[in-house]
Amino acid sequence: MKHLTEMVRQHKAGKTNGIYAVCSAHPLVLEAAIRYASANQTPLLIEATSNQVDQFGGYTGMTPADFRGFVCQLADSLNFPQDALILGGDHLGPNRWQNLPAAQAMANADDLIKSYVAAGFKKIHLDCSMSCQDDPIPLTDDIVAERAARLAKVAEETCREHFGEADLEYVIGTEVPVPGGAHETLSELAVTTPDAARATLEAHRHAFEKQGLNAIWPRIIALVVQPGVEFDHTNVIDYQPAKASALSQMVENYETLIFEAHSTDYQTPQSLRQLVIDHFAILKVGPALTFSLREALFSLAAIEEELVPAKACSGLRQVLEDVMLDRPEYWQSHYHGDGNARRLARGYSYSDRVRYYWPDSQIDDAFAHLVRNLADSPIPLPLISQYLPLQYVKVRSGELQPTPRELIINHIQDILAQYHTACEGQ
């Protein structure tokens, strides 16, 4: 299963291809992605972050083995071949334990890496850029690289122990600002300089040599950089190729390396394609997919209100709002302003903090109620046209069934299609 190494080889040979990484644990998002990859006969890269999934359960309650089982079971149910499925771990390092002393945080990070690799994750992003409780701020490149090399050694040993060979593919480096969208309002963003990228690479190369890991350097397939793309609650900073041209040219001097771009959500299709052409050939997408899921659910809730007596409605939007107000920990430090501004952000922000609430049992019950209400009888075409106009065109042409579930899946796939097109290459 060398899909990623082969993709990099083809890209370096001039194909201008890439791959997108689906960064979500939501079952409908994953179903949409698996079905889309199946229809287009492409490999599918699905990633879990160190916040979502860890040896203690993360915020999803899943360990890496649980997540793999969940994804593989879904793939099997949709007849998607497991050898076309690539699982990745994102920002693996002491991220979850920055409030602990470095020694303790890195011991946890060792176990995190072991749990991901033992579970069969093959794309491993080593990220030790964050300062722990007793660390200087910021860390030097050398300290970051030494810690990453330590984790790489753990990963290699674990992989050989469980699978008989070390066939992992690595990503190193990190972007600024922090993962998951910026907290503040953005207007300008610093692109990683070629010198900074080279310094990161050389520090890691030196640290890997000290750990006796020279042989794995060709399996370090990507460096995470900031090409100048980001989003906040209501704005998107679009990719400007001219600002990243020196960075783009710099990676051409490395035979087996491309760039990985995070926070590519909400970029235009043209920008996504240009990112891949400019060697930012692994595109991470997460919030844009759950944002699209949320759009579809809000549209279906509006249709439900037109069709179903008020007392029989699911009340999905009100349930969602009530739960978010009752448990504000996932949005309170992100959304600011007066009451109305925060209300709008809870429902509509690009940063999509609402994604943390979909697993809640009350919200899930309301979702199931909504789907039942709309599955009982055909949804009138004019209402689909009003609230889901892109899906309406496909319903009218006969390529899409107008059931609640299919409308949701297809709405998410409209975003996936943009990434697929960007990554196809020449």
Swiss-Prot record:
One GO term of the biological process aspect: D-tagatose 6-phosphate catabolic process
Pfam families reported in the protein's UniProt record: GatZ_KbaZ-like
Superkingdom of origin organism: Bacteria
Segments traversing the membrane: none
Pathway where it operates: Carbohydrate metabolism; D-tagatose 6-phosphate degradation; D-glyceraldehyde 3-phosphate and glycerone phosphate from D-tagatose 6-phosphate: step 2/2
Database matches in InterPro entries: Aldolase_TIM, GatZ/KbaZ-like, GatZ_KbaZ_carbometab, TagBP_ald_KbaZ
Gene3D superfamilies given in the database record: Aldolase class I, putative tagatose 6-phosphate kinase domain like
SUPFAM superfamilies the UniProt entry points to: Aldolase
Any GO CC annotation of this UniProt entry: plasma membrane
HAMAP family assigned: Tagatose_aldol_KbaZ (MF_01295)
Job description of the protein: Component of the tagatose-1,6-bisphosphate aldolase KbaYZ that is required for full activity and stability of the Y subunit. Could have a chaperone-like function for the proper and stable folding of KbaY. When expressed alone, KbaZ does not show any aldolase activity.
Binding partners and assembly: Forms a complex with KbaY.
Family that this chain belongs to: Belongs to the GatZ/KbaZ family. KbaZ subfamily.
Protein name according to UniProt: D-tagatose-1,6-bisphosphate aldolase subunit KbaZ
Organism of this sequence: Escherichia coli O8 (strain IAI1)
